């Protein structure tokens, strides 16, 4: 469960955003445009949430935060899209990085797997100062789960608040509070 660097993309492989389109290929067979077609930014954001909340050091390959696509080398080394960045993805990265910075348990806390199921994963990061439960639903519909957050130190009388919610059409930083 320990890793040194949490990478979704790097200079040796196709970019993670491209991999969300489920196309395996190279530019010489499919063309560079195919790397950008059918991408799933919701899945990309789910990956970034795991990257930023898992143990280890999250490492962003330049351009991932701006929505750069690309098949395997050399296509994955496209230039940074100065002035044409995906502003929603940039904002998302800034917000999730801020959450990591503001919540020590996401940087140095213990990790505990919670409830997991088909297209669903949940785990907790916690220390003596705080607890975060991370729930990722990759289904195409809402699901209901009972998560035993007491396992990560949330008191039975405690409250939890959704601080980030990602959807197909974007994300929001406002959420409901649960008891």
What are these regions (language model features)?
Residues 40-41, 55-60, 66-179:
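Carbohydrate-interacting/catalytic domains
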């Amino acid at each position: 469960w320990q890793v040194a660097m949490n990478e979704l993309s790097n200079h040796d492989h196709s970019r993670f955003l491209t991999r969300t389109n489920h196309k395996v290929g190279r530019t010489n067979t499919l063309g560079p445009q195919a790397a950008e077609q059918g991408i799933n930014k919701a899945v990309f954001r789910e990956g970034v949430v795991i990257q930023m909340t898992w143990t280890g050091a999250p490492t962003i390959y330049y351009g991932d935060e701006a929505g750069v696509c690309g098949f395997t080398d050399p296509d994955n080394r496209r230039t940074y899209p100065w002035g044409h960045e995906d502003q929603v993805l940039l904002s998302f990265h800034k917000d999730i990085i801020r959450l990591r910075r503001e919540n020590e348990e996401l940087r140095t806390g213990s990790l505990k797997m919670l409830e997991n199921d088909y297209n669903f994963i949940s785990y907790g990061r916690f220390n003596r100062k705080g607890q975060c439960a991370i729930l990722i639903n990759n289904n195409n519909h809402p699901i209901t789960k009972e998560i035993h957050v007491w396992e990560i130190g949330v008191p039975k009388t405690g409250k939890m608040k959704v601080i980030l919610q990602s959807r197909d059409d974007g994300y929001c930083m406002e959420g409901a509070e649960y008891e």
